[in-house]
Amino acid sequence: MFTVIVDDLVFADGSTRMGVLGGGGPQTAFGFRTHPGNFSVGLAAGIGPDFPRECEDWLDANGVDSEGLMLVRDDDMDTYGAAEREGGGGEASASAFVARRERKKLDEKKDAPDAQTFRPTPRAWQITERDGRRTQVWRTPANAGLYAMLRPPAETLPPRYRGARAFHVGVHPERPDAALLASLRRSLGGGDARLGASKAGWLSVEPFTRATRPVPRETLEALCSAGDVFSPNELEAVSLVGKGSPLELCRRLAAAGAKIVCVRRGAKGAVAHDAETGETWRVPAFFSEDQSGALADVTGCGNAFCGGFIAGLASGESLDRAACWGSAAASVVAEHVGVPAAPAGDAGTREEVRRRFEALLRRTEKIVGDT
């Protein structure tokens, strides 16, 4: 899982919640960890020495490995505009990333070139409107170095992360990190016999925003075909292939090279499609029947869905079951401001997610023809 941002939340009623762990990676990890497969999960991202202790504690409590969270030397002063022109969303040499355990050694080298300050942890305002629209405003200076922190080069991954059973990455649809995705594809599986002879592992790709302008066909095909799973929300899908029904969106994305497509629709659930078999499922969103599960904050729900979905696929489950795991995990995140306090791996959390999964599975519909 990639990307960590510390969010400062501003709600439509004027209330705020500061210093919340976010960025997509933690929420995806939460969704992944709610699955009964009890997978080990790690995060890869650049953080600063100011990374809040509370955020570190949450990762520990949820069984999320943090070795992949690395410090980044503050030696790249490129502007955001430069990052845009280069088209990579911000790139940095792997040598700029420093394992946190190495920081003390660097601090002791007072006169050495490495004895530099480190970039701060990525931090942003997340402003939610009454109609559900959310606007992100960077508090950390937006430059090439910041974007590199969100998706570090593959060569910075700890050795035990390489050969993982699955990777999940958020990318900009206009500037997909082709080099990173290709590197992760080569790393998948690591010879894990549990995956079977036909499947080395799963690479899941999620756009983290809508396209602001038409995407060239070549870029669209590179984006859709880079992974095994392509999971945009409905607005993101429309920005890529135009308006249409969820089934039409899935088919257009599949025609662009996506193998498994899952179009997430918020309160309307999701539609999942397998391009090879033509199988398509409509999965509802879960809503609690009592007030104990009132909607609190939808930030990160899509990420949690992706985590549960890819965990189901990595376990060898069918497309509809995997999508139900995703929807169940997303519903838990929606009932909390920020990441849930109760750890994903707790028996109580997993039992609640399983209960929701079973309820969703009974209501899931197979789409036949053009309906």
What are these regions (language model features)?
Residues 6-15, 19, 36-169, 194, ...:
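Conserved N-terminal subdomain of the carbohydrate kinase-like
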Residues 30, 124-127, 269-272:
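Short beta-strand scaffold segments in enzyme catalytic cores
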Residues 32, 233, 302:
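Short, conserved phosphate/pyrophosphate- and ester-handling motifs at nucleotide-, phospho-/glycolipid
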Residues 14-30:
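Short catalytic helix/loop segments, enriched in acidic residues and glycine
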Residues 30-40, 312-315:
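Alpha-helix C-terminal capping segments
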Residues 166-252, 268-270, 275:
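Conserved beta-alpha-beta core of the PfkB/ribokinase-like small-molecule kinase fold
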Residues 189, 216, 246-371:
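Conserved phosphate-binding/catalytic region of the ribokinase-like
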Residues 1-5, 204:
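Short, hydrophobic/glycine-enriched beta-strand segments
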